[in-house]
């Protein structure tokens, strides 16, 4: 009889008021502590190890941009890239054209060993193709499994 494998799904939701431009900036980052939902004995000072399944972002005041690019790093300076630059088309809301969302399918295992701080946090950077109107990175969500 085959062994049954159980996956545990987790998510990390962050909100913010970061105004995005057309280049990455260390001030425009969402910090996701992916160990926050783990039991205390598993998360204290632990490197993150899991499979990032997907990333969702929501922008507000986003009348002009049509595309968003994300990068996920192991450090706040953006020097240890775990998920390289990935672009997606923004989809406008049905009733609010300046509220736009994008979804990214990642599906890669990540083990935070590349010299980052090893604190279980991943740093989500974002930029847009047109910064007119000061689009805001209002929410981001990283879904992962162990």
Model-derived features with residue positions:
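Beta-rich globular "head" domains
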Residues: 30-73, 143
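Residues within well-ordered beta-strands of beta-sheet-rich folds
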Residues: 56, 107, 123-127
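C-terminal interaction-tip segments
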Residues: 1-24, 119-120, 127-146
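Short, surface-exposed linear segments at secondary-structure transitions and domain or protein termini
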Residues: 16-17, 92-103, 146
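Ser/Thr- and Asn-enriched, surface-exposed coil loops between beta-strands
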Residues: 22, 26-28, 95-98
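Beta-sandwich interaction modules
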Residues: 97-121
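Solvent-exposed serine/threonine-rich low-complexity stretches and specific carbohydrate-binding patches
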Residues: 10-15, 83-96
């Amino acid at each position: 009889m085959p062994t049954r494998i159980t996956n545990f799904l987790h998510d990390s939701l962050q909100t913010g008021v970061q105004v995005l431009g057309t280049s990455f900036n260390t001030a425009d980052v969402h910090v996701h502590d992916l160990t926050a939902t783990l039991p205390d004995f598993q998360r204290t000072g632990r490197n993150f190890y899991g499979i990032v399944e997907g990333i969702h972002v929501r922008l507000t005041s986003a009348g002009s941009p049509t595309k968003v690019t994300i990068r996920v790093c192991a450090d706040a300076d953006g020097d240890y890239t775990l998920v390289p630059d990935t672009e997606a088309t923004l989809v406008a809301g049905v009733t609010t054209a300046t509220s736009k969302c994008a979804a990214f399918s990642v599906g890669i295992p990540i083990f935070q060993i590349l010299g980052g701080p090893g604190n279980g946090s991943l740093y989500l950077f974002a930029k847009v193709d047109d910064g007119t109107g000061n689009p805001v990175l209002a929410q981001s969500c990283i879904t992962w499994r162990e």
